[in-house]
Design a protein with these regions (language model features):
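A metal-dependent hydrolase signature that marks the N-terminal structural subdomain at the beginning
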Residues: 10-103
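Short pre-active-site segment immediately N-terminal to the catalytic Zn-binding motif
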Residues: 128-145, 163-169
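Catalytic Zn2+-binding segment of zinc metalloproteases
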Residues: 151-167, 181-187
Length: 209
């Protein structure tokens, strides 16, 4: 289940590696599917507000993504880590083409990125260049995947998983792992906001990484 997969993100697990071609009709143990991918037409309302949003589609998807990611972590955090899950403090949107934005005590002019700010427990993203580029290249769920990765960094801090001096590559791969566990939850049909097929939908997300 989810707990076992999450454990694999943080520890070495026993087992035998199996080729992805072992069963051509399954992907990671899930049936190969070509159904819809993206925001559900009857998606639940977002639980988070986005600061400095322009009210556009990209910020809508980002806000829904964080709401959904937090729904997931709320349901599994205490099963896997000490303490209770606490949502990030705020969500911040900016336009990297503008000169007057700030994130994590720094200017957002030219900041084509999405990130978790440890200093104030916020997650932010560039709606001017980054999010539109992600959507155009790999679909709406590319935004969700990138933000799931950033939320993985929030989980690392919350659960105190990495000691000072942990190699950046290790922390980034662990955040990727956390994002992958969330996306599997979506692919299994558990998300009240998004769907993800294991054909082109999943392939597009892997291309985003």
């Amino acid at each position: 289940g989810t707990a076992m997969v999450l454990t694999a993100c943080a520890t070495t697990v026993a087992g035998k590696p199996v080729s992805v071609f072992d069963d051509p009709f399954k992907v990671g143990g899930l049936q190969a599917s070509d159904g819809p991918t993206g925001l559900r037409p009857d998606a639940e309302e977002p639980t988070r507000e986005v600061t400095d949003t322009d009210g556009g589609k990209d910020d809508e998807i980002a806000g829904q993504s964080i709401s959904d990611i937090e729904t997931f972590w709320e349901s599994v955090y205490s099963e896997n880590f000490d303490g209770e899950f606490k949502p990030v403090r705020a969500l911040i949107s900016w336009d990297s083409n503008a000169y007057d934005g700030t994130f994590c005590d720094d200017t957002t002019e030219g900041l084509i990125n999405a990130a978790f700010c440890e200093d104030d427990s916020t997650i932010g993203w560039d709606r001017g260049v980054l999010l539109p580029s992600l959507r155009q290249a790999n679909g709406d769920m590319a935004i969700t995947m990138v933000l799931a990765h950033e939320y993985g960094h929030a989980i690392q801090k919350m659960a105190k998983l990495n000691k000072k001096g942990t190699p950046t590559l290790v922390a980034e791969q662990q955040a990727d792992c956390f994002a992958g566990v969330y996306l599997r939850w979506v692919a299994e049909g558990n998300s009240p906001r998004f769907t993800l097929n294991t054909g082109d939908g999943l392939n597009n997300l892997l291309a985003t990484m």
